[in-house]
């Protein structure tokens, strides 16, 4: 019997997919495409010679073998994170490494970075976005700024900053702008709506809040990541749905409009850090972010 381990990238893709029960969410967390995660899962199944998932309606269900590997891989990765964190304990002089999605970084945090650095000069903030696993337990990451829904994991210290609000947005350059800008929300049922595979429930959830049957919506062009979705909306390619803070600058500049406003979701913008990685700077950062949101909401 071979004792060779499967490729590490394949194990990471499996561990994230099994933990989140979603290929799309695993892709978003690992900041790769849906297809890349699917390929790594196939590599792992071929290496082991067994099936780890079976189709369950529109989702996936772990096989018995998959459940065994999920438990083992979760324990192994957690142990690796703990040991690596112990080996790389930061001193007070080390930068504070904050992880967040590229979309949140580019569209919300960067416009405020000058004020943050001026108000917290000793923080020495280092931003981690783009490639990499944005799991807050990842070695080398001090905290994670993320939209997420409670309940929070027991091993996490979480600072809730504000409730998430989402809504449809479009550009004045969009061909349907004049027709839709003063129409009721139900008028969107006739549009091919821009959407992202990382948040497949965004449109259906919004529709239910507005008394619209989700099945009446028509999906148009899809995008792997939210950043590209919003770029498409700014370019006038259609109506997108987005968290309010990520389109705030575009709304102020007139590049986008939100005729139907924004609605709260169960999610929060929150700062996460593992309980085992207590750092007083996280509290300072959370206080600054919350004050910034109160001073200038989005």
Curated annotation (Swiss-Prot):
Stored PROSITE patterns: HTH_LYSR
Entry protein name: HTH-type transcriptional regulator TrpI
Lineage: Bacteria, Pseudomonadati, Pseudomonadota, Gammaproteobacteria, Pseudomonadales
BP-aspect Gene Ontology terms: DNA-templated transcription; L-tryptophan biosynthetic process
DNA bind region: 23-42
Described purpose of this protein according to its UniProt entry: Activates the expression of the trpBA genes, which encode the two tryptophan synthase subunits, and represses initiation at its own promoter.
One Pfam family this sequence matches: HTH_1
PANTHER family assigned to the protein according to its UniProt record, in alphabetical order: HTH-TYPE TRANSCRIPTIONAL REGULATOR, HTH-TYPE TRANSCRIPTIONAL REGULATOR TRPI
Similarity field: Belongs to the LysR transcriptional regulatory family.
């Amino acid at each position: 019997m071979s004792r060779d381990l499967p490729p590490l990238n394949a194990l990471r893709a499996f561990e994230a997919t099994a933990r989140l029960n979603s290929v799309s969410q695993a892709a978003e967390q690992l900041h790769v495409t849906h297809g890349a995660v699917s390929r790594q899962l196939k590599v792992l199944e071929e290496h082991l010679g067994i099936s780890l998932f079976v189709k369950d309606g529109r989702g996936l269900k772990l096989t018995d073998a998959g459940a065994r590997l999920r438990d083992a891989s979760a324990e192994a990765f957690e142990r690796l994170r703990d040991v690596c964190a112990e080996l790389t304990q930061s001193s007070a002089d080390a930068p504070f490494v904050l992880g967040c999605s590229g979309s949140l970084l580019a569209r919300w945090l960067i416009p405020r970075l000058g004020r943050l650095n001026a108000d917290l000069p000793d923080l020495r903030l280092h931003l981690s976005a783009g490639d990499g696993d944005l799991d807050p337990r990842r070695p080398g990451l001090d905290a994670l700024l993320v939209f997420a829904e409670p309940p929070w994991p027991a091993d996490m210290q979480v600072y809730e900053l504000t409730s998430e609000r989402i809504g449809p947005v479009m550009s004045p350059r969009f061909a349907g702008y004049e027709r839709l800008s003063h129409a009721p929300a139900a008028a969107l049922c006739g549009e091919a709506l821009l959407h992202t595979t990382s948040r497949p429930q965004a449109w259906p959830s919004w529709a239910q809040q507005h008394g619209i049957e989700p099945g009446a919506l028509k999906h148009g062009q899809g995008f792997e990541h939210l950043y590209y979705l919003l770029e498409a909306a700014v370019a006038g390619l259609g109506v997108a749905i987005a968290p309010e803070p990520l389109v705030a600058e575009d709304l102020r500049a007139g590049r986008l409009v939100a005729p139907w406003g924004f609605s709260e979701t169960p999610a929060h913008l929150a700062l996460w850090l593992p309980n085992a990685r207590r750092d007083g700077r996280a509290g300072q950062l959370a206080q600054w972010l919350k004050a910034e949101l109160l001073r200038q909401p989005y």
